[in-house]
Every structure is written in C-alpha cells, then in structure tokens.
C-alpha cells in the first residue's frame, strides 16, 4: 500500500485539498515586524484572570507591531461548554477595549481567515494531515 492509498483510506471523502485551502487563505501581506496573534479561549464559563492576561498580551503585541489580533473560540470541549460563555468572553474583552480584528460572533464573521470556531476547522486540518501522510511526513504513534 502506498502512502497515497493510506491517506485515501483514512480520509476518503474530503471535499477540498491543501491547494484549495492555501488559495483560500493566502499568506498575509504583513510588513516586517507585524505580528498576528490569537486568543483562543474555551467557552466553558467566565473569563478568568489568566485568560484575560493572555488576551491583553496578545492584543498589545499585535497592535504595537501594526499587526492583527484575532479571536478563535476553542469549542472542542463540548462536555464543559457553557451556552453563554462566548457572549461573556466578548463582553469582557469589549469592556476593556480589547476588540479583535478578526472573529466570529453571533453569526457574523469578521476577517478572511475563518472559520474562527475551532470545531468548524476540522476539514482544513484533515486536508493537511492527509497531505502529510501522502508525502510520508505523518507520524506513526504507537
């Protein structure tokens, strides 16, 4: 069995490949020194001081460099997810003037590199995993 055969066996029905995603999400046109930072909270309740500190640090790094600060909700912990947590996170950030440049909130997508909800990015990751298997760069964990 070839690596391509294995990749096709594991991911038989992917709608898009790596080339598609790389054309959809081209490299950002950043000036030298500009940073792209991400705050990726899990929507499992109120924002705590550690999360706020990370958001503030990421925001300041991005803004001081002329870069981009984005919010991506890490909604993969479905057992502990709290319905209103995303609203609580956004309202806390906005209360302190930390407004993401890119985000997804209440059905609105702001930015060109979404989805900004982790669980909605699965197909992107699967395409890259499939490519790594095809070119024999995937790791076999035992």
Model-derived features with residue positions:
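N-terminal Rossmann-like or analogous alpha/beta NTP/dinucleotide-binding catalytic cores
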Residues: 2-142
